[in-house]
């Protein structure tokens, strides 16, 4: 038995949304597109559909081979048995190879150009209404989904994230201006496909206040360029987004009386108090300013602003070391 299923949405991504227009995110009629697709699929038949799927998937998946052991021992062992042995402390490099490739497979299956980026639980979870509305959490979750994308030779799978970030820029400019009196754009801990960039409605700033997550998202734009060396992408799409994020970062920093700069107020993602110069925030500040500096050099633009970024970077409060020799997460032990 062959089941053919199609699905679509009337959602249309919009990089320049008009929030006075209730249809600013409305595109195609899904009844028409799904009917067309199902008819075309029926014409193709199972074997042709399977071969097209296999060619599409393996073109990405087969790019990377990972071999942690040359041993062929236990390669046919069932996964349940492997996991049981692994939990007992027995080494299984082949299981680790499988897990790495499983992660690549999940990204291939959930993040392709023209679609939404991978979200909190994915679309195949076992709930009618998934935890946290299965949205996009910008304070580590969506970044974590894409950490291995380029390094695992799946740069195409980054495009849904790139487009999602682009869709946050215009509403993020309003958030930057309204909440922080800053240039540029930013986002908050939670976002959705309809341009939501403001903090959530809560008095608990320890987890809800995290304006530096916008620049954290923007670092993925430079990472994509860094791997692909697509200068046209950097010039036409990437640089302005990175630059605008760096401008927000500059305006958000506190220029202290001693001449140094620090992120204040700042928080560590959903962990600990509101503080001055949280290490997480300073790490992101350093990265986005470095990305902006490098991008402007590659394109040979904005030398004056680049000098400002370099000056602030040099005067950013350094990471602090605690009484036990540890890297402090907050300003004091």
Task: Please place each PLM-identified region on the residue numbering.
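Alpha-helix C-terminal capping/termination sites
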Residues: 89, 96, 108-109, 145, ...
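Extended ligand-binding clefts on enzyme/binding-domain cores
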Residues: 95, 134-156, 168, 174, ...
């Amino acid at each position: 038995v062959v089941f053919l299923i199609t699905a679509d949405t009337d959602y249309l991504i919009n990089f320049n949304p008009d929030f006075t227009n209730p249809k600013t995110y409305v595109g195609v009629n899904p009844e028409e597109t799904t009917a067309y697709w199902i008819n075309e699929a029926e014409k193709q038949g199972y074997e042709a559909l399977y071969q097209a799927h296999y060619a599409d998937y393996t073109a990405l998946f087969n790019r990377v081979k990972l071999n942690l052991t040359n041993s062929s021992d236990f390669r046919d062992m069932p996964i349940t048995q492997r996991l049981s042995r692994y939990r007992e402390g027995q080494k299984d490099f082949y299981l680790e190879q499988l897990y790495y490739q499983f992660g690549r497979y999940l990204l291939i299956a959930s993040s392709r150009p023209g679609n939404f980026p991978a979200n909190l639980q994915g679309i195949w979870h076992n709930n009618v209404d998934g935890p946290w509305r299965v949205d996009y959490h910008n304070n580590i979750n969506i970044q974590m989904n894409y950490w291995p994308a380029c390094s695992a030779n799946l740069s195409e799978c980054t495009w849904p994230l790139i487009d999602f970030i682009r869709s946050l820029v215009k509403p993020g400019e309003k958030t930057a201006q309204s909440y922080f009196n800053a240039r540029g754009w930013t986002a908050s801990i939670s976002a959705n496909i309809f341009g939501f960039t403001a903090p959530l409605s809560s008095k608990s700033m320890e987890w809800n206040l995290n304006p530096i997550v916008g620049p954290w998202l923007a670092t993925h734009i430079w990472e994509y360029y860094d791997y692909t060396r697509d200068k046209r992408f950097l010039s036409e799409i990437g640089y302005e987004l990175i630059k605008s994020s760096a401008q927000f970062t500059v305006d958000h920093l506190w220029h202290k009386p001693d001449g140094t700069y620090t992120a204040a107020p700042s928080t560590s993602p959903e962990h600990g108090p509101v503080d001055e110069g949280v290490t997480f925030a300073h790490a992101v500040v350093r990265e986005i300013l470095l990305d902006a500096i490098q991008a402007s050099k590659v394109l040979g633009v904005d030398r004056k602003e680049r000098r400002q970024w370099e000056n602030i970077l040099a005067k950013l409060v350094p990471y602090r070391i605690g009484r036990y020799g540890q890297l402090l997460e907050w300003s004091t032990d």
